[in-house]
Amino acid sequence: MTLPTLTNLLIMTLSYILPILIAVAFLTLVERKILSYMQARKGPNIVGPFGLLQPVADGVKLFIKEPIRPSTSSPFLFIITPILALLLALTIWVPLPLPFPLADLNLGLLFLLAMSSLTVYSLLWSGWASNSKYALIGALRAVAQTISYEVTLAIILLSTIMLSGNYTLSTLAITQEPIYLIFSAWPLAMMWYISTLAETNRAPFDLTEGESELVSGFNVEYAAGPFAMFFLAEYANIMLMNTLTTVLFLNPSFLNLPPELFPIALATKTLLLSSSFLWIRASYPRFRYDQLMHLLWKNFLPLTLALCLWHTSMPISYAGLPPI
């Protein structure tokens, strides 16, 4: 590999990673501001104008602190897990069309599904390597929840593939030329949105960090830099899920918009969806664990399977009919 090629690769990678990290940093500020205004207070307003530099101050503070490792923990896994979590959270963005993906994969949706499944390992290893009963119980809860809700996410993705006829994310824009999929497949969109809340361990499904029983969940033993990495990974996953929701169900089209406006439309819709994540956090109490599992296995799974069957059978049944 020549030096110009390496330089080009580095520039491309940085140009796609840095905006994500900056967006994630400011998402934390948006969350604190929204929650504070909902609770009739000001929120962060000291660091910088209107508190805009608060994420920078928080990041610097966390990364210059001394990372503490429990003496009984597993050293290698304890250190490698937060790095793996952040690396996976950033890698998943590769096939997303913003408007052009970093790598236009033929099986982009399957890549997303496979990479999001790998995040389970970072949760499990962090809980196990901490050698703490609270961290382990929190990790087991998180893994059970993530694996469970991935089932419905996969089936809903399969249904959207049936509608678009392709595994690439770019074709979803062409599929949604006449109408957004959120209107034509609204039951799927509703279940997808609730499943993304559970998949990212957000309220009201944040059972992994039940403070009254688990202190803080799987990352209870982490501090300073490693904790910041987990935090960044969690919020990067929230941004990713909302971007994916926009691409799947609210995709702004190439034909209706100039390419320059595509990222603006995508970012606006993603921000609105992320804000509704935060609104839900401020509004709803936490679910009981059995309710969380019943919602998936007894309600969502039969419904998504039926809708997937419907989306599979309808094109076949219409195939023999003459055009209207």
Curated annotation (Swiss-Prot):
One Pfam family from the record: NADHdh
EC number: 7.1.1.2
GO cellular component, one term: mitochondrial inner membrane
Membrane topology recorded in Swiss-Prot or TrEMBL: Multi-pass membrane protein
Keywords: Electron transport, Membrane, Mitochondrion, Mitochondrion inner membrane, NAD, Respiratory chain, Translocase, Transmembrane, Transmembrane helix, Transport, Ubiquinone
GO molecular function, one term: NADH dehydrogenase (ubiquinone) activity
Subcellular localization(s) per the UniProt record: Mitochondrion inner membrane
Record field: catalytic activity: a ubiquinone + NADH + 5 H(+)(in) = a ubiquinol + NAD(+) + 4 H(+)(out)
Residues annotated as transmembrane: 10-30, 76-96, 107-127, 154-174, 178-198, 230-250, 260-280, 300-320
GO BP annotations, alphabetical order: aerobic respiration; mitochondrial electron transport, NADH to ubiquinone; mitochondrial respiratory chain complex I assembly
InterPro entries hit by this protein: NADH_UbQ_OxRdtase_su1/FPO (IPR001694), NADH_UbQ_OxRdtase_su1_CS (IPR018086)
Subunit structure of this chain's protein: Core subunit of respiratory chain NADH dehydrogenase (Complex I) which is composed of 45 different subunits.
General function of this protein: Core subunit of the mitochondrial membrane respiratory chain NADH dehydrogenase (Complex I) which catalyzes electron transfer from NADH through the respiratory chain, using ubiquinone as an electron acceptor. Essential for the catalytic activity and assembly of complex I.
Record family assignment: Belongs to the complex I subunit 1 family.
Protein name, entry field: NADH-ubiquinone oxidoreductase chain 1
Organism: Gallus gallus
Gene, per the UniProt record: MT-ND1
